[in-house]
């Protein structure tokens, strides 16, 4: 009873924090000049991370098994993983802007998990016999950590593509207020440099303008390089987790069902995900394919991950059909 009450309190606290963080992000989306809100956002992310950690630990204690038995628990663990990974670039010098790209993923994942849509599966239940294994922690945690890292890395690649398209087709994006608004959301510093250059274009001192124009291109190129750098490294980490998760899952499947691989929808899409990011890592070794070319592959992988993790589960077929259904024993 005490554990259930504590979990209930932490769930509401984390949901309240997430609601506030969404509001802060919307404000910074519309008014990029309010810099102090970014610090509030990061502090809120830390507090939400500890709330989720406490929630998962409490749920683990009173349920008697690692909290990864249904969609609600896996979403909370995914949100925890995204929050953890989002802190990595934040501690690096001058890399705080990367955390503002990754952060919203953790926010909206947790918001969906704690919303009323999944209320009926918030209660923890007894696992079916096949899942009462030590492999549950190894397999599922590695898979979700892999999904989280791959999602973060892919999101950075999507951001890289947006910047590259803005660079190549500036006239289209600057004339479209919707894209200009999106630019101020993730890339406020670059948008600020664009405005400075537009002002300088009206000055007679062309050499002064040329200096600032080259400065703008320099910062844009540096930003693209940082996105490419972090995207590659985070995806490499996620690929390692995904590989360990697939291999451990194959061993567990052989113990539980007598077969290493059954080609059910979940396994098939996990294999497709692995292939896509293996291609990304392979072409990334070629200097000519770095940057936008490899980012296209990672962006495709971003969609495939969500199909593999979320979409396939909701089909309700195969050995992994635990999407919106609780794994209870008869």
Swiss-Prot record:
Which GO BP terms sit in this record?
cytochrome complex assembly
Task of the protein: Required during biogenesis of c-type cytochromes (cytochrome c6 and cytochrome f) at the step of heme attachment.
Complex formation: May interact with Ccs1.
Q: What is its main location?
A: plastid
HAMAP family, per this entry?
Answer: CytC_CcsA
Database matches in InterPro entries:
Cyt_c_assembly, Cyt_c_biogenesis_CcsA, Cyt_c_biogenesis_CcsA/CcmC
Transmembrane residue ranges: 9-29, 44-64, 65-85, 97-117, 143-163, 234-254, 263-283, 295-315
- List the protein's name: Cytochrome c biogenesis protein CcsA
Which family, according to the similarity comment? Belongs to the CcmF/CycK/Ccl1/NrfE/CcsA family.
